[in-house]
Amino acid sequence: MFINRWLFSTNHKDIGTLYLLFGAWAGMVGTALSLLIRAELGQPGTLLGDDQIYNVVVTAHAFVMIFFMVMPIMIGGFGNWLVPLMIGAPDMAFPRMNNMSFWLLPPSFLLLLASSMVEAGAGTGWTVYPPLAGNLAHAGASVDLTIFSLHLAGVSSILGAINFITTIINMKPPAMSQYQTPLFVWSVMITAVLLLLSLPVLAAGITMLLTDRNLNTTFFDPAGGGDPILYQHLFWFFGHPEVYILILPGFGMISHIVTYYSGKKEPFGYMGMVWAMMSIGFLGFIVWAHHMFTVGMDVDTRAYFTSATMIIAIPTGVKVFSWLATLHGGNIKWSPAMMWALGFIFLFTVGGLTGIVLANSSLDIVLHDTYYVVAHFHYVLSMGAVFAIMGGFVHWFPLFSGYTLNDTWAKIHFAIMFVGVNMTFFPQHFLGLSGMPRRYSDYPDAYTMWNTISSMGSFISLTAVMLMVFIIWEAFASKREVLTVDLTTTNLEWLNGCPPPYHTFEEPTYVNLK
């Protein structure tokens, strides 16, 4: 029965497929919103109307891309599909809770869309800072609906995190230690721990904001002894781990892709890679106030957060150089997935370098809330997380579907996307250095040239998205079945065929440990 299979599913592969489809759909919405932003900024003057509607679009773009595209695809899609296969588990630890985690997302998405349809919309930015998000500056239901949307997405992620942690620790073969699980499994487990520790703090913050708006509490209102800076601390204590949540599963996927297409049987420095991810996860919790260098913190506080932020570059560097060392001396296969992985390593490193610049509290005073910050986080997200997703997708698509993509088209798609995202975001560094502020729908004529180039780049990326839809259609229409898979001894997920049967590892797995 269709309903029994897709609505009441308890199968990790089906739920993973649902997550991938939902994430792809949300990605289209998020892309459309980003194109609205770039259309508005393509030339001076107004296109959409006032700044409120512009900021509603910006806010929705952020929420859709983060909570409904990257997280569902990386953690829900790839995580559900691959983690049980990689550790030889028959399914997730809590299969019905797994289904609920997914089905909380469409209602959450619906609430977010509703928030932009009522009143004037939530034009707060994804940070939802009071007093702008208070009931004076944002009267009406919009911000409340956004808060409810975040609550649902948060519950979904917390339940998913519990599920993954339990599965990864508890459902390995008895003889297999944690240090024999693949790096993608590690990355998902560390991501789940970050989610479990950070999301409750966000929930507390937005719940207090909700009561400030509706029940006359004053958590964030100085008139009643509250402090809007408290909200910023609560939000960023979640918000900074969140950005590592978005990239860590990508690290895991890139490790697998680089190892596979270098013809290696293991990544360089496995233990170092695990240590690096754990370090990044830990450090991610003690650097949050680097988002707040302009709110008037003590000089010693700023010095600490500057130093702590820079320390994160060390484990990140360990990962980058280990990927390069994995490539070294390998029999490199120039597949589309490998191109995405190499693009990831290069562009993620560029994004990391601008992050080191922003970590300096003195420089950040000048660069805060300019397009330099936008350029920085889009290099690590739009070219880090997205390139990892694309690399993972073209690498594991034959496993998920049983069909192969057209290699040539996939490489053309990569080339168009590479040109598009770089043309979009590289000029934004220049805009930021010349002082163009974020979150404005219009700008002085002096900024016209780089904005026009940036907007042209975004439309190149759009053609890449449309080409990807065609490539996937072409694969299903042509039905080229998978013939053989290399290196299955060190890539267990391929062991059961392409696609694997509905139920895998129904009997306990026999592991021969070397």
Swiss-Prot record:
EC number(s) on file: 7.1.1.9
Residues that coordinate or bind O2: Y244
Domain of life: Eukaryota
Electron transport recorded as keyword: yes
Cofactor or coenzyme needed: heme; Cu cation
Cofactor remark from the record: Binds 2 heme A groups non-covalently per subunit. Binds a copper B center.
PROSITE patterns assigned to the protein according to its UniProt record, in alphabetical order: COX1, COX1_CUB
Annotated metabolic or biological route of this protein: Energy metabolism; oxidative phosphorylation
Catalytic activity: 4 Fe(II)-[cytochrome c] + O2 + 8 H(+)(in) = 4 Fe(III)-[cytochrome c] + 2 H2O + 4 H(+)(out)
Membrane-spanning ranges: 12-40, 51-86, 95-117, 141-170, 183-212, 228-261, 270-286, 299-327, 336-357, 371-400, 407-433, 447-478
Binding sites annotated in the UniProt record for Mg(2+): H368, D369
Complexes and interactors: Component of the cytochrome c oxidase (complex IV, CIV), a multisubunit enzyme composed of 14 subunits. The complex is composed of a catalytic core of 3 subunits MT-CO1, MT-CO2 and MT-CO3, encoded in the mitochondrial DNA, and 11 supernumerary subunits COX4I1 (or COX4I2), COX5A, COX5B, COX6A2 (or COX6A1), COX6B1 (or COX6B2), COX6C, COX7A1 (or COX7A2), COX7B, COX7C, COX8B and NDUFA4, which are encoded in the nuclear genome.
Membrane topology, record value: Multi-pass membrane protein
One GO process term, biological-process aspect: aerobic respiration
Pfam families for this protein: COX1
Main location: mitochondrion
GO molecular function: cytochrome-c oxidase activity; heme binding; metal ion binding
Binding-site residues, Na(+): E40, G45, S441
Crosslink feature (1'-histidyl-3'-tyrosine (His-Tyr)) location: H240-Y244
Function: Component of the cytochrome c oxidase, the last enzyme in the mitochondrial electron transport chain which drives oxidative phosphorylation. The respiratory chain contains 3 multisubunit complexes succinate dehydrogenase (complex II, CII), ubiquinol-cytochrome c oxidoreductase (cytochrome b-c1 complex, complex III, CIII) and cytochrome c oxidase (complex IV, CIV), that cooperate to transfer electrons derived from NADH and succinate to molecular oxygen, creating an electrochemical gradient over the inner membrane that drives transmembrane transport and the ATP synthase.
PTM-bearing positions, type N-formylmethionine: M1
Recorded family membership: Belongs to the heme-copper respiratory oxidase family.
Binding, heme a3: H376
Upper taxonomic lineage: Eukaryota, Metazoa, Chordata, Craniata, Vertebrata
Residues given in the record as Cu cation binding sites: H240, H290, H291
Protein's organism: Bos taurus
Gene3D superfamilies in alphabetical order: Cytochrome c oxidase-like, subunit I domain
Name under which the protein is recorded: Cytochrome c oxidase subunit 1
